[in-house]
Amino acid sequence: MPEDEIIERAREDEREGKLPSTQAGEFVRDEMEHIREGEHGARSPQQAIAIGLSKARRAGVKLPPPKRGKASTRTRKQAKRDLAKGRKGRGKKPSRKRSRATKRALKREGRSAASRKALSRQARSAARRRSAASRSRAAKKAARTRKKRG
């Protein structure tokens, strides 16, 4: 379960009118921090990001599932499930056996998924997949919604 301060930071982003992807970024950043601190590992930066996005959706961030063709059917279905979980609020307590199994599986993975080199490679490949217009639009919005200094 994500810490309360992460959820609070995401809520603050929402109040400031930032996109759900920015709100979800708080959870992804937190996940990277967990890997760096050695709490658990991840097979790749993509897996670490996916875990963060899943936690964000379950915490109530209104991040829509990826569009058809952008991600696998399984990923899209899981994102839909996470979103529904986030809308419904916490149901029954998660199974202890499952939680321990996932935790142990992640503990066996390496820590290099959150290294500067791996994240830089991931960021570059993600940027390459976007059009110039999309990148420009995002930069303009970032400048518009950036916190004012002072």
Language-model features: locations:
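A charge-rich, low-complexity, intrinsically flexible signal that marks solvent-exposed coils, linkers
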Residues: 1-150
